[in-house]
Amino acid sequence: MKGLLALRDFRLMWAAGGLDNAGRWMDTVVMGLLVLDLTDSAFQVALLFVFRWIPMLAFALISGMIADRANRWAVMMVARFVAVASTAVILALVLTGAVEPWHVFIASFFLGCLFVMEFPSRRSLIYDLVGSERIVSAMSLETINTTIGRFAGPFMAGLLIELTGFKGPYIFLMVVYVIALVLIMVLETRGPVRVKPSYSFWSTVSRGFKYSLNNSVIRSVLIITLIMNAMAFSVESLFPVVARDHLGVGAGLTGILISAQAIGSLAAATVIASLAVVRYHGRIFCLGLGLQLLSLLFFALSPWYPLSFLMLLLAGLGAAGYSTMQSTIILISAEPEMRGTALGMLGQCIGVAAVGGLAVGIVANFFSAQAAVAMSVSLGLVLLLPAVFFSPLVRRPIAQAKEVA
């Protein structure tokens, strides 16, 4: 782990990623509470989640192709500019008192575009920097990054909203995103372009689908990811509503509650990063998702804030194992010229969270937020049992794809 942080460009990317993750989780909570304050509607809060994730569903495969062909540094720079511009517009609207829900929805969409653009390019560039032998440690450090951001972002969001209203969080977000932009700007590594720029889009799409579906390991990760994001991650959009309406707490305690997942994830990701050798990546992946789903189910059933906090902490433990191994398995299993495209396929499955977010929003509108969480997670458990049972992820180690010189 120390050796990775000794690499200048990896260290800069890691620092920028930490700031970006803190900003991403912070603006997720701030936007959710802002829309809830403006509309008092659980459905519209869930709809905000849909706007954030629909770009992943629509554009992930395209962004994966770009990662295989374009300058990955340039892609990351464009994403950083999108973050700064979107946040600046919302900040101006909040400062002038002119903000409306549709403004927040559009900003959420553009920030979703940022994530989908950067997702495969960033991970492919990390693989180029560290290689296959250190990719588990690198992805664990990425998970630690996400986890710290997942803790610091909601915590700062709740604290600043309590102290300053919605102005303080957006000023803070501007500072965070500008610093992340500067850190990416000074990278020396641009990343190799392995594929010639002339290509047929639809033949590449077809090849990406065939390649991913014919590889049993990648196919299993994609199927499980699709179920997890549709049924589990989509319910996170309702956490602010559950905190306010079911647990009866304000913005400050809501931020702390949502940060609970990060505490568990940080502990688990640190342990994974310290492992010298990981043979059964798939077992960690599957154990993680099982723990996460069960914890979310008990969170939905909990009537007490301390128990809800504990359940989200345990969900974070599971999420660390799941998310660390998710990209790692894809990167190890895919051939070099197909890594970006395979990650794009993964992004498509992650983007299904938009559909799940819409579904849980509708259920919450008719019943309650906690009922929507419980129903969605329960269905996810039922669907994942056969998906895990018939996959090769638990039975054998992940084989390394052949490198092309």
Predicted segments, located by residue:
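Helix-loop junctions on the cytosolic side of multi-pass membrane transporters
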Residues: 97, 124, 128, 170, ...
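Short, membrane-interfacial amphipathic segments enriched in basic
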Residues: 1-8, 192-203
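Substrate-agnostic recognition of the 12-TM MFS/MFS-like secondary transporter fold
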Residues: 11-28, 51-65, 71-86, 103-161, ...
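Helix-loop boundary and gating motifs at the non-cytosolic
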Residues: 1-55, 210, 214-259
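Transmembrane alpha-helix termini and helix-breaking/packing motifs in multi-pass membrane transporters
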Residues: 32-38, 90-96, 152-172, 245-246, ...
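C-terminal transmembrane bundle of multi-pass solute transporters/carriers
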Residues: 57-62, 75, 89, 102, ...
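Hydrophobic alpha-helical transmembrane segments
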Residues: 101-108, 112, 137-192, 235, ...
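Helix-breaking motifs and short loop linkers at transmembrane-helix boundaries and internal kinks
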Residues: 39, 71, 93-94, 98, ...
